[in-house]
Amino acid sequence: MPPKASKKDAAPAERPILGRFSSHLKIGIVGLPNVGKSTFFNIVTKLSIPAENFPFCTIDPNEARVYVPDERFDWLCQLYKPKSEVSAYLEINDIAGLVRGAHAGEGLGNAFLSHIRAVDGIFHVLRAFEDKEVTHIDDSVDPVRDLETIGEELRLKDIEFVQNKIDDLEKSMKRSNDKQLKLEHELCEKVKAHLEDGKDVRFGDWKSADIEILNTFQLLTAKPVVYLVNMSEKDYQRKKNKFLPKIHAWVQEHGGETIIPFSCAFERLLADMPPDEAAKYCAENQIASVIPKIIKTGFAAIHLIYFFTAGPDEVKCWQIRRQTKAPQAAGTIHTDFERGFICAEVMKFDDLKELGSESAVKAAGKYRQEGKTYVVQDADIIFFKFNVSGGGKK
């Protein structure tokens, strides 16, 4: 029997995360018109998982599911040589272009903002290339201005939402002395002041109890952002762009989230080539696609991780939200696993790779038995034991 993990081995408790607690999270592509959103989405769509891999899901034309590349998964497949290989995926939604005044319904404003509310994170595409053939909605290329336009629209929509919430709470407080109503009202006032000060919700210093309430609101500025700076192929190849320093300075002043420079023109060219020709082109020009990096960064940004189940029949990534405990992780495989959870037998990927086999991991005392309070970590390799009424153990 594997040793039980001691309390000192447990990961330190984390503050709750802003956002939905689900293993089915998605990221949306956001930006002004003509910045490269749809081109980026079309490139990603070429890499998307065939619909038949999800027989019980209808994938909308503006949605794509793409494999998350991972050398650890590849290594496990080489080790076990399974009959079936199932990697993790990222769901990406293409969202219509925003225009100034969207919060008040301009353009496709209300639909646009409701689509952002439905996703869990944002790929914010910025135009950092000049092209007379591609018009800009504001008649000039200025990525920092574009950043401020979208930031303001999202904050204004959040202010509108929070003000409506305040109004509703005040009506309810007249009819009830419920302390929870008062707490929510105080929080809403703080959030409104925070937004009116030009700050996004995700950068607020919120208590755990605040976050639990905020997560019921699905505020637009609570969602994590990855900035994708779309430049010309020439600028991308020479790794130099006149707009990039100003973009970097702005992002550092506004939360310091991840910036990934890329080129839709280059990625589209590469996507249209046969794989061997694309590899040769990249080698000759000392350049590489950043689409894999974008996918992995987006996956992590919305707080998704995955654990592995591994054996000769199947190696599979089971994606879960960070901070998920073992019984809930087991439930992603089957509800019976969660309902009748006994324990999780856990190997760390690094231990398996270092030692070379499950038997060696067990011999080294690194094959652990974890209970209901164990928080699953990224790349854990897990075998669940469960027992349900009328059933047996797995």
Curated annotation (Swiss-Prot):
Species, as recorded: Oryza sativa subsp. indica (Rice)
Q: Which positions in this protein are listed as binding Mg(2+)?
A: 38, 58
One Gene Ontology term of the biological-process aspect is: negative regulation of response to salt stress
| Entry's transmembrane regions | none
**Keywords, comma-separated and alphabetical:** ATP-binding, Cell membrane, Cytoplasm, GTP-binding, Hydrolase, Magnesium, Membrane, Metal-binding, Nucleotide-binding
Source organism superkingdom? Eukaryota
For this entry, the protein name equals Obg-like ATPase 1
Q: Which GO terms describe its cellular component?
A: cytosol; plasma membrane
TGS domain location is 303-386
| Regulation of activity | Activated by GAP1.
OBG-type G domain: which residues? 25-282
Q: List required co-factors.
A: Mg(2+)
What family, per the record? Belongs to the TRAFAC class OBG-HflX-like GTPase superfamily. OBG GTPase family. YchF/OLA1 subfamily.
GO molecular function annotations of the record: ATP binding; ATP hydrolysis activity; GTP binding; GTPase activity; metal ion binding; ribosomal large subunit binding
